[in-house]
Design a protein with these regions (language model features):
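Transmembrane-helix signature of 12-pass secondary carriers
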Residues: 1-470
Length: 470
């Protein structure tokens, strides 16, 4: 890669404020993983208490996703007008309110509606927090800091599966307990500054942005050159017609390649089958003859593998590269689903084949969590130009959650109509399509500053080969 003039030197140290930003990002990711994952085990208790069938189960599971679509779209407007910092404070408050409202829901309908409120916070967090951290972080560790969010999703899922596997814990307690980390997130965010890039672009506050950079950069970091680069870009943005900024700016032809890549990755992270496994693994297994306790233990094991691969990805993504890592891992996920589906289609799904079925599930989680899942929020945080970043990340987040919503609302119905093996094969083919998309469209962004990525877009150089030459 050619170093652009005026780039800040690579400095890998973290100071207290940047570490706190990573912690807040991690808590928001933990809440996302926990609030979405807890429903997997809780549905078994909820269905017994409220006497509900598959349609209501799908509605309860999907409530958080509908709220996430609304939250991701709404929070883009809020973080552009009021700033990333204050928007995250609002999200923290909604996390608290949503968790407590779910815990006291009187019936299935009330629970589904409460999960819509909780989903607003989840969607808002996925749209705002990775972008906020990316705008605060130095480029040399930006990928790893943003992936703290993704890593914490894995932690949340593991905690949720462990809690869900303990039938001694009421589903009301397990869902309401999420209010505690949400309160910690609120207290942590109160200590953090606004994004320096937002301060310059929206407020013209160069001095304020300089103070923020002094707070979040380690000693010895060349703040002036980084500030000059941000300021120069912001001046060019401000000279741009307002019709080329925000939501209206998404119509520009030079922005479109970033939207295609970002939204395409968002769709395929969901179509890869990850949510099918997270939400419904216990239900699918018990419906096909697994003892309930064994199904819950498998769910915990899947969560642990997810977390381990998030940790591995956190440390290698800035070394191996986003594109290369994804291309290596996706074929393994596809093969796992093809083999898994084959067991069910050929009738080899009895107790004698339980170890092989579980091995396929774990292998899928290994390859999926260690590859494609890492890219969902990372690409959205770094791929879009500053003038449209909030709107574009909102579209990407809403695309992801809408795809997730569609899958969650239809999965159990699809399994009833076609069979579990056939559904596994459908998702295996989606993984094949994901690999082709990444190979064809996704450039290697590792080592490029946000401003350098934007220059490639403006120069119409956003194909994988364009970045390979730079």
């Amino acid at each position: 890669m050619t170093q652009a003039a005026g780039q800040a030197p690579r400095t890998n140290g973290l100071n207290g404020h940047m570490l706190m930003a990573a912690v807040v990002s991690a808590i928001s990711g933990l809440l996302y993983g926990y609030d979405t994952g807890i429903i997997s085990g809780a549905l078994l208790q909820i269905s017994e208490e409220f006497h509900i069938g598959n349609t209501i189960k799908e509605t309860i599971a999907a409530g958080i996703l509908l709220g996430a679509v609304i939250g991701s779209l709404s929070c883009s407007l809020l973080c552009e007008r009021f700033g990333r910092h204050r928007t995250i404070l609002l999200i923290c408050c909604v996390f608290i309110a949503g968790s407590l409202t779910c815990a006291v829901a009187p019936n299935a309908v009330g629970l589904a509606l409460a999960r819509v409120l909780l989903g607003f916070a989840v969607g808002g967090a996925t749209q705002t927090v990775p972008m906020y951290v990316a705008e605060l972080a130095p480029k040399s560790i930006r990928g790893r800091l943003v992936l703290c969010f993704q890593l914490a999703i894995g932690v949340g899922i593991v905690i949720a599966t462990i809690v869900g596997a303990s039938e001694a814990v009421s589903w009301r307690v397990s869902i309401g307990a999420a209010a505690a980390p949400a309160l910690l997130m609120l207290l942590g965010q109160l200590r953090l500054p606004e994004s320096p890039r937002w301060l310059i672009l929206r407020k013209g506050d160069v001095e304020g942005a300089e103070e923020v950079l002094k707070e979040v950069r380690p000693k010895g970091y060349d703040i002036r050159t980084e500030l000059d680069e941000i300021t120069a870009l912001a001046r060019r943005q401000q000279r741009t017609d307002r019709s080329h900024q925000g939501w209206r700016g998404l119509r520009q032809a030079w922005v479109r390649p970033a939207l295609v890549v970002g939204c395409g990755i968002a769709v395929f992270t969901q179509l890869s089958g990850i949510e099918m496994i997270i939400y419904y693994a216990p239900t699918i297994l018990t419906d096909n003859g697994f003892p309930r306790a064994d199904a819950l233990r498998v769910s915990v094991a899947l969560g642990v593998v997810y977390l381990v691969m998030m940790i591995v990805g956190l440390w290698i993504v800035d070394k191996v590269g986003r594109r290369r890592l994804t291309l290596v891992m996706v074929p393994g996920a596809a093969l796992s689903l093809f083999v898994l589906g084959g067991f069910y289609i050929t009738g080899h799904d009895g107790r004698a084949y339980v170890p092989a079925i579980v091995a396929c599930l774990l292998a899928f989680m290994f390859f999926n969590a260690g590859g494609l899942q890492l890219m969902g929020w990372l690409t959205g945080s770094e791929i879009y130009p500053l003038s449209v970043r909030a709107a574009a990340t909102s579209v990407q987040s809403a695309t992801l959650w809408s795809t997730n919503l569609l899958i969650t609302l239809t999965l159990l119905t699809m399994i009833s109509a076609f069979g579990v093996g056939q559904v596994f094969w459908i998702y295996a083919f989606f993984n094949v399509a994901a690999w082709l998309f990444v190979w064809w469209k996704m450039p290697e962004l590792t080592g490029h500053s946000l401003e350098d990525i934007e220059r490639h877009l403006k120069n119409h150089e956003f194909q994988p080969d364009d970045f390979a030459r730079s």
